[in-house]
């Protein structure tokens, strides 16, 4: 590699790392190699499954680096190596070749949703380990974490990761036998095959898979499903013994799956257990910026921040809010989505999810908080750090977040021009204090009653 080529490639990596989350960079970029730059074409060696990501996300990076170093537009030619994920992708083991030559396996509909991929999964601190583990499993199925057990509340991306794993493996090995299924549907299939007295067909279908993706495994945790648990236990063993990958999702940890046989709980913990928690403000903004690409509207940045401040429990609420906005925008024939439009569109959803929300001016909250703690509104908005003023300021921010539908940036602006992260810090601090301090709870209820 020439000196200029090295400078060019270092610049590509530098720009990519500055624009991507670390886990995304590590997986999609770090192992790529520049072979040469000839004329205005850069030849890059990488895994073929990562080409689409480069085409969608890194072309501008290469162009920028090309102009900086060579003062010309650089295009990319991809060369693909035979990757580990290809050579180790799920395949039928050789010791079964003779057996399977005379036995036709039933066709398996994989039921994967093609819209879910690693490329369009938004990474934050709350899901980084789950994402990294999922990428690792897809890259080397059956060898790294088996099973992979992902748990967390609804609407946090567990199903997205399941499908992304399946789609990634399928891209590497189109012949892989993959099945995505909810635990509820597994139960239903078991019941149907019992009634038809055709259990051999069910065993062939599930025990000869290369990759089994089970969603919401907690549905299996019932005493009345002992026979189904037995069948799943045997299916799990058959797959695991043959180094076939199993990925499970749940709304709780394996140990919290009451009424699930202990031998299954033990097996669920054989591999890696990772948690996904609700997205923080920055991740919600990133999710919204990703999702709005599906809509033909222009969202103002303050609108995105407003929406991110309204729904903090899961991604489905954010997706639902965008659908609400789309309906209003279509009806009113709008091109630009302002905060006012968004607030109108999501009002019903906010009332359903947070019936406590009331239209209250932030100034009223500041006045009542100030009276209670013996400070002025001016002091609350100031930069003074005396203990009683800081407490009043944080309580005011907490109540503004709890009792109004204002975004975090808007609340911060009303409290002396502070940014959303300061408001979020104050909110979380008071929330934690309320969980431990009964006297603060009483103070809070007193202030709330005066505000109302």
Curated annotation (Swiss-Prot):
Region span, Domain II: 84-110
Sorted UniProt keywords: ATP-binding, Cytoplasm, DNA replication, DNA-binding, Lipid-binding, Nucleotide-binding
Pfam families: Bac_DnaA (PF00308), Bac_DnaA_C (PF08299)
Residue ranges of the region described as Domain IV, binds dsDNA: 330-452
GO CC terms of this entry: cytoplasm; plasma membrane
Chain residue ranges for the region called Domain I, interacts with DnaA modulators: 1-84
Span list, region Domain III, AAA+ region: 111-329
InterPro entries named among the record's database cross-references: AAA+_ATPase, Chromosome_initiator_DnaA, Chromosome_initiator_DnaA-like, Chromosome_initiator_DnaA_CS, DnaA_C, DnaA_dom, DnaA_N_sf, P-loop_NTPase
Major location category of this protein: cytoplasm
Molecular function GO labels: ATP binding; ATP hydrolysis activity; DNA replication origin binding; lipid binding
Alphabetized HAMAP family for the sequence: DnaA_bact
Function: Plays an essential role in the initiation and regulation of chromosomal replication. ATP-DnaA binds to the origin of replication (oriC) to initiate formation of the DNA replication initiation complex once per cell cycle. Binds the DnaA box (a 9 base pair repeat at the origin) and separates the double-stranded (ds)DNA. Forms a right-handed helical filament on oriC DNA; dsDNA binds to the exterior of the filament while single-stranded (ss)DNA is stabiized in the filament's interior.
Swiss-Prot/TrEMBL domain comment: Domain I is involved in oligomerization and binding regulators, domain II is flexibile and of varying length in different bacteria, domain III forms the AAA+ region, while domain IV binds dsDNA.
Record-given protein name: Chromosomal replication initiator protein DnaA
Organism: Streptococcus mutans serotype c (strain ATCC 700610 / UA159)
């Amino acid at each position: 590699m020439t000196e200029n080529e090295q400078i060019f490639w270092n610049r590509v990596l530098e720009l990519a790392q500055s624009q991507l989350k670390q886990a995304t960079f590590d997986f999609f970029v770090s192992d790529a190699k520049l072979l040469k730059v000839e004329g205005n074409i850069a030849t890059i060696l990488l895994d073929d499954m990562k080409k689409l990501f480069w085409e969608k996300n890194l072309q501008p990076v290469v162009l920028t680096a090309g102009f900086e170093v060579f003062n010309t537009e650089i295009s990319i030619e991809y060369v693909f190596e035979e990757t580990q994920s290809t050579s180790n992708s799920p395949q039928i083991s050789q010791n079964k070749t003779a057996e399977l030559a005379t036995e036709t396996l039933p066709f398996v509909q994989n039921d994967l949703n093609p819209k879910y991929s690693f490329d369009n999964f938004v990474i934050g601190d709350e899901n980084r380990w789950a994402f990294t583990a999922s990428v690792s499993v897809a890259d080397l199925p059956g060898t790294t974490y088996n099973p992979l057990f992902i748990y967390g509340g609804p609407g946090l991306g567990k199903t997205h990761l399941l499908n992304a794993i399946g789609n990634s493996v399928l891209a590497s090995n189109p012949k892989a036998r993959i099945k995505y299924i909810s635990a509820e549907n597994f139960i239903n299939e078991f019941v149907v095959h019992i009634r038809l007295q055709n259990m051999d067909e069910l065993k062939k279908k599930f025990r000869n898979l290369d990759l089994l993706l089970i969603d919401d495994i907690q549905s299996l945790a019932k005493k009345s499903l002992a026979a189904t648990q037995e069948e799943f236990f045997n299916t799990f063993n058959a797959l695991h013994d043959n180094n076939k990958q199993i990925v499970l999702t749940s709304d709780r940890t394996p140990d919290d799956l009451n009424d699930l046989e202990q031998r299954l709980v033990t097996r669920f913990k054989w591999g890696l257990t990772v948690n996904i928690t609700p997205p923080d403000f920055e991740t919600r903004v990133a999710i919204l910026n990703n999702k709005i690409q599906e809509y033909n509207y222009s969202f103002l940045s303050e609108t995105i921040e407003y929406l991110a401040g309204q729904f903090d429990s899961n991604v489905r609420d954010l997706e639902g809010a965008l659908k609400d906005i789309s309906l209003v925008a279509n009806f009113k024939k709008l091109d630009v989505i302002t905060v006012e439009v968004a607030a109108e569109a999501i009002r019903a959803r906010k009332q359903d999810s947070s019936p406590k929300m009331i239209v209250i001016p932030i100034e009223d909250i500041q006045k009542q908080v100030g009276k209670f703690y013996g400070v002025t509104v001016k002091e609350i908005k100031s930069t003074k750090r005396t203990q009683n003023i800081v407490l009043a300021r944080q309580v005011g921010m907490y109540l503004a977040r709890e009792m109004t539908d204002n975004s975090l940036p808007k609340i911060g602006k009303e409290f002396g021009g502070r940014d959303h992260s300061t408001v979020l810090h104050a909110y979380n601090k008071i929330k934690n204090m309320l969980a431990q301090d009964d006297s603060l709870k009483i103070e809070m209820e007193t202030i709330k009653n005066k505000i109302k």
